[in-house]
Amino acid sequence: MTGSRLQPAEIEGAWICTPRIFGDDRGSFLEWFREEDLSAVLGYPPDVAQANWSVSRRGVIRGVHFADVPPGQAKYVSCVRGAVLDVIVDIRDGSRSYGRWQAVRLDDVDRRAVFLSEGLGHAFMALSDQATVMYLCSTGYAPGREHGVHPLDPALGIAWPSGAEPVLSGKDAAAPTLDEARRAGLLPGYGDCQAFTERRRAEHGRARQGRPGEVSLPGR
C-alpha cells in the first residue's frame, strides 16, 4: 500500500496494516486493502469470497471464532466507524504460541487493519456505540465448519477493557473453553495450517510458471 506499513503481529500468521492517510480540506483518502502487499508476505494472493459488515453497541464481544482447516477462513478486518479492541488468538494446537493472544485497537482515526491467516481465532469488543466493523473473508459462511471458544475463558485470559458489561450472543456464551475445544478435537492443528499455507504457495508458484509469455529454462 502506498505509504502504508504492513508489519507482522506477535502471533505468527497475522499482520497489522497502518495506512497512510491523505487529508485536505475536502476530507481524506487511504488505500484500505491492496492485494499485492498481502501477496508479498503470504507468498500467494489472498482469496476474497465474502465481505461482512457488523454494527455493535459498546460492550458487545464477538468471538472467539475460527474455522476448520482446510480450508479455514482468513480475515482482513477494519473498523470503519467508532472503535473496537480486536484480538488475535492462537488456537492452533501444536503452535509454539498456542493459547497466546494479541489485542489491537482498530478505529476510525488511525484506520488500521488486521489480517489473520487460516487457523487463527478472532474476536473483538466494541469500545463505542455503533462500532462498525468491515471484514473480508477468504471463504463464505459455512456453519458446519465454523466454531468458537468462549471469549471470557479465564485460562485464555484476554484482558478485555473494564467499564462496560460484556454482551455476548447466546452462541458465544455457550462456546467451550479453549481446553474443552482442544479435548473435543475442534481446534485446527498447527501442522495442518502450515501444510495448507505451503500448498497455497506451491500452487501460486506453479501458476506463475505457467503464465503466457514466461519461459521456464532447464536447470533453473
Can you annotate each of these PLM segments?
Residues 106-129, 136:
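Conserved metal-binding segment of the jelly-roll/cupin
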Residues 1-109, 130, 142-220:
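Non-catalytic, conserved peripheral segments adjacent to functional cores
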Residues 135-137, 143:
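Extended, polar beta-sheet/loop recognition surfaces of beta-rich domains
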